[in-house]
């Protein structure tokens, strides 16, 4: 229903009577002032007008400020968006707000992973302890194969335990606080394992003889078969014979044999024994001038296929040195080089004992006499050095300088015999001549096992073979460098000693330098059937550098391809 205006006015009067009274009072006052002070009416209206304008201007000024602030804010936000990536700006806050449940789940997963890894570590440690206390695994009838497998298992377990601990450290690092102490008894256990550790030579178990020769009794060494490595092995056996027969050993002349004093220190042998047990040929000749310079008795260890393994040409060389040979070549027993019999100390003393001043025995390289004694670390003779026959001081120092320059401490040495080895190996069963790709696989396995950084290559192989071998020796996707001794370079000083003493171009010095470097390696890979390799193994055994990872190339394998016979 509509209401008229009078009703509205009545309601208004009832609702706000105070306002109405003030209005009426103000109107009465204005009216009275206008009546009594007519001249001042204009002035009063001017003041009201001024106040009204001031208020109006204030409102305008305030509005301008709001506009300026608003525009500035818009510009600032625009610049912020232009100069930064909005996603990066709000990523941290939004992600922390939205992904907090996921973050909690990640933490729970990490802690769960830590628990599982700890359980794995305990299980591996249990396996590890079981391998250590079960020596029967190393004493099985399949000695070689089972021992290698056993060592590989132990190495793998050790690596897994180390990896396990590393993973735990990574997962645990975000959860650590300043007062965290999460160590356990397991962490304090030393489970490190060196797969290619040094071999315990058990020197206390050596069986030796004393070498105390009579100063007027001599044994002339005859070593003719093979090259320098054969002769050095022969010379070591001659020392054993001289010790058993109480004689001074005469080192052969370079006109009849190799020049031994260039590669080994002869006088050092006397120092190791503490007495004169060996004498150079020239010294022997000076002593013999007082008497008749001759060989009183020439005894042959082998009777076939040729007495003493000596031909007429070598007899002429001996006589050319001014030595006369009384009597004929004789053999105390029937002995074939191809099938040598096992002989004892008593056999030698009985068959080779003589009252003659000078006797010669040859050739004893193939002699199979007390091999257990001969193959001991340091040999069968009691002395105070590590070994009696070792490289000269010049060669030792040069080898050390080469290793410091090119190889470092942890390196593998490889004797890779190729020249003339194909026919030699194929005459054996099984053959020992391996195709390059197969050889590379065998080498890579040893590198992986030993963690060697570089390989020193001692070889007579052609460049075509060594280049292919280099490209194929790959471990973990990386080619393992093969290092050979470089040609002479005046800027390099590692070989300065050899040049200073004028022996840099001697092939036997080079060969002995190669042997020395190989003998000092962390791990050695040799060539089966090579006496060069055997002499390196002798040095490693005597020096205590032999490793449990030392082995012949591709040991236990046959070549995957063998050529037919001629």
Swiss-Prot record:
Which N-terminal residues, if any, form the signal peptide? Answer: none
BP-aspect Gene Ontology terms: fucose metabolic process
Swiss-Prot/TrEMBL keywords: Carbohydrate metabolism, Fucose metabolism, Glycoprotein, Glycosyltransferase, Membrane, Signal-anchor, Transferase, Transmembrane, Transmembrane helix
Disulfide topology = none
Composition bias, Basic and acidic residues: 1-14
Q: Which compartment or compartments is the protein found in?
A: Membrane
Does Glycosyltransferase show up as a keyword for this record?
A: yes
Keyword Transferase included in the entry's annotation:
yes
Instruction: Tell me its EC number(s), please.
Output: 2.4.1.-
Offer an example of a GO molecular function term for this protein.
peptide-O-fucosyltransferase activity
Membrane topology, from the record? Single-pass type II membrane protein
Q: Where is this region: Disordered?
A: 1-37
- The record's principal subcellular location, in a coarse class, is membrane
- Where, in this chain's numbering, is substrate bound? 415-417, 531-532
Q: Which PANTHER family match?
A: GDP-FUCOSE PROTEIN O-FUCOSYLTRANSFERASE 2 (PTHR13398), O-FUCOSYLTRANSFERASE 36 (PTHR13398:SF7)
* Protein name, UniProt field: O-fucosyltransferase 36
Organism (species): Arabidopsis thaliana (Mouse-ear cress)
The gene name reads OFUT36
């Amino acid at each position: 229903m509509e209401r008229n205006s009078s009703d509205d006015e009545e309601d208004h009067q009832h609702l706000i009577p105070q306002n109405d009274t003030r209005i009426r009072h103000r109107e009465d006052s204005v009216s009275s002032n206008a009546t009594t002070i007519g001249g001042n009416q204009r002035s009063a209206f001017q003041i009201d007008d001024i106040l009204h304008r001031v208020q109006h201007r204030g409102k305008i000024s305030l509005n301008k400020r709001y506009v300026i602030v608003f525009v500035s804010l818009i510009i600032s936000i625009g610049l912020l968006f232009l100069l930064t990536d909005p996603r990066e700006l709000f990523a941290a806050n939004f992600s922390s707000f939205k992904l907090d449940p996921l973050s909690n789940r990640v933490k729970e997963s990490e802690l769960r992973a830590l628990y599982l890894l700890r359980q794995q570590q305990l299980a591996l440690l249990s396996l590890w302890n079981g391998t250590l206390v079960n020596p029967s695994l190393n004493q099985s009838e399949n000695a070689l194969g089972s021992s290698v497998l056993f060592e590989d298992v132990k190495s793998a377990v050790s690596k897994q335990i180390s990896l396990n601990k590393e993973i735990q450290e990574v997962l645990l690092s975000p959860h650590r606080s300043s007062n965290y102490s999460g160590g356990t008894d397991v962490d304090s256990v030393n489970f490190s394992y060196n797969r290619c550790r040094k071999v315990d030579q058990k020197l206390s178990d050596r069986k030796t003889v004393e070498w105390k020769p009579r100063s007027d009794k001599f044994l002339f060494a005859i070593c003719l078969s093979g090259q320098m490595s054969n002769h050095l092995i022969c010379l070591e056996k001659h020392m054993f014979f001289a010790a058993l027969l109480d004689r001074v050993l005469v080192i052969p002349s370079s006109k009849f044999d190799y020049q031994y004093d260039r590669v080994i220190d002869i006088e050092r042998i006397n120092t190791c024994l503490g007495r004169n047990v060996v004498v150079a040929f020239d010294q022997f000749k000076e002593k013999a001038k007082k008497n008749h310079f001759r060989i009183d008795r020439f005894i042959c260890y082998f009777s076939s296929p040729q007495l003493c393994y000596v031909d007429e040409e070598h007899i002429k060389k001996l006589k050319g040195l001014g030595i006369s040979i009384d009597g004929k070549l004789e053999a105390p027993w029937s002995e074939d080089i191809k099938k040598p019999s096992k002989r004892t100390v008593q056999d030698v003393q009985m068959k080779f004992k003589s009252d003659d001043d000078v006797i010669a025995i040859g050739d004893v390289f193939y002699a199979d006499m007390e091999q257990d004694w001969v193959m001991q670390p340091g040999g069968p003779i009691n002395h105070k050095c590590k070994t009696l026959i070792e490289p000269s001081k010049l060669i030792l120092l040069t080898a050390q300088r080469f290793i410091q320059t090119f190889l470092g401490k942890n390196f593998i040495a490889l004797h890779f015999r190729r020249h003339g080895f194909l026919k030699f190996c194929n005459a054996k069963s099984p053959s020992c001549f391996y195709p390059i790709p197969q050889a590379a696989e065998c080498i890579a396995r040893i590198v992986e096992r030993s963690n060697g950084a570089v390989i020193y290559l001692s070889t007579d192989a052609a460049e075509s073979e060594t280049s292919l071998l280099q490209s194929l020796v790959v471990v973990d996707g990386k080619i393992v460098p093969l290092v050979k001794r470089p040609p002479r370079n005046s800027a390099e000083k590692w070989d300065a000693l050899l040049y200073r003493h004028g022996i840099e171009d001697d092939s036997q010095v080079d060969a002995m330098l190669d042997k020395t470097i190989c003998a000092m390696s962390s791990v050695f890979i040799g060539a089966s059937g090579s006496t060069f390799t055997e002499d390196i193994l002798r040095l490693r055994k005597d020096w205590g550098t032999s490793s449990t990872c030392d082995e012949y190339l591709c040991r236990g394998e046959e070549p995957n391809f063998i050529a037919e016979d001629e």
